[in-house]
UniProtKB/Swiss-Prot annotation:
This is Orotate phosphoribosyltransferase. It catalyses: orotidine 5'-phosphate + diphosphate = orotate + 5-phospho-alpha-D-ribose 1-diphosphate. NCBIfam families: pyrE (TIGR00336). It is an enzyme of class 2 (transferase). The gene is pyrE. It holds the Pfam family Pribosyltran. CDD domains: PRTases_typeI (cd06223). Orotate binds at residues 133, 161. GO terms for biological process: 'de novo' UMP biosynthetic process; pyrimidine nucleobase biosynthetic process; UMP biosynthetic process.
Length: 187
């Protein structure tokens, strides 16, 4: 999606390098034996919670994601609990767009809603995700948002592990826009 990316290849590369340095500096990239939420085994782990709780790194993520959001023609920034919430909140603050939080399941008390924030059928949203592997969590969130009549065409992820999320989201008529890929990060 050329319209949602910064203007030049050099600018994109500069932004990637800035984010990669920040992710490594805050300890978000770890090596060892890990089991991912998808159930897959991995020799590395991207702990974006480290990044989203570090003000400097979160600000870099928010600024870079906001540049892309501004070109997407959306009116709401959404995040899936838990990992997407601080990211979407920061991007909401950076862009001035309203925030929507999508719960993974209906809560059994209070409003019993899967959503925190206003959601109308005419809304156009971008979803924020911390790390994408298979894209399963965000696909589920897109489905429940679309059931309300709202439109989700884009998902911005901080790191795409390049393990099928892009293709799965394309099948769901949504475009994955990674700030960096695992290949970028592990070079």
């Amino acid at each position: 999606m050329s319209q949602s990316k910064p203007d030049t290849g050099n600018e994109i590369e500069t932004q990637k390098q800035e984010l990669i340095a920040a992710l490594k500096a805050c300890g978000a990239v770890r090596y060892g034996d890990f089991t991912l939420s998808s159930g897959k085994k991995s020799k590395y782990y991207i702990d974006i919670k480290k990044a989203s709780t570090d003000p400097k790194t979160l600000k870099i993520i928010a600024r870079q994601a906001a540049l892309r959001v501004k070109e997407m023609g959306v009116g709401t920034v959404a995040g899936v609990e838990l990992g997407g919430v601080p990211l979407a909140t920061a991007v909401s603050l950076e862009t001035g767009l309203p925030l929507l939080i999508v719960r993974k399941s209906v809560k059994e008390y209070g409003t019993k809603s899967r959503f925190v924030g206003d959601l109308r059928p005419e809304d156009r949203l971008v979803m924020l995700e911390d790390v994408t592997t298979s894209g399963g969590s965000v696909r589920d969130a897109i489905k429940v948002v679309r059931e309300t009549g709202a439109c989700v065409k884009y998902v911005i992820t901080v790191v795409d592990r390049e393990e099928g999320a892009k293709e799965k989201l394309k099948e769901a008529d949504a475009e994955l826009v990674p700030l960096v890929t695992a290949s970028d990060l592990l070079k």
